[in-house]
Amino acid sequence: ILHAEKVKIYAAASLTNAITDISRLYEQQHRDIQIVPVFAASSVLAKQIAAGASSDLFFSADLDWMNDLIKKQKIQIGQIRPLLLNELVLISPIQQKNHFKMSADFNFAKAFQGYLCTGQMESVPAGKYAKQSLTRLGWLNPLRGRIVGTDSVRSTLAFVERGECQVGIVYRTDALMSKKV
């Protein structure tokens, strides 16, 4: 990669802003190098790499997809470096003014009407982490039938911004970029 003229980066959709900003700065300092970012759900990108798509760098939001690529011998364990951290947050449309007050007797399922939106709980990293959190808190089962799974955090954010879901679980960095939640 050090001598490449083009560097193709596959990155989780949740990293769109960060990778775009970093790429611009890098290209300004290294005018002979072009960064070509490709953003999608980590699962989609990992499947593309497994099928033979070429990428110089892969930023996954989920270690499971990295491990899948190791098993398929598409990357080596020594190539993995944890670089970024994020956290899940609960969002709602700004006009909704939900005020969730956490306490020992808090009933999340009754705290809002309608749907909760997050990434697909079996494949999208944010959805997998949301499922773990909701399960740990004992909130998953009471919400069954009210959870909408999306293909990425950005899709979840869009659903909540439009009011199609009353609440959503996304990464903090994605929530902070929106003026509508």
Listing of model-derived features with the role each one plays in the protein:
Residues 2-30, 34-53, 60-63, 67-73, ...:
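Exported/periplasmic ABC-transporter solute-binding proteins
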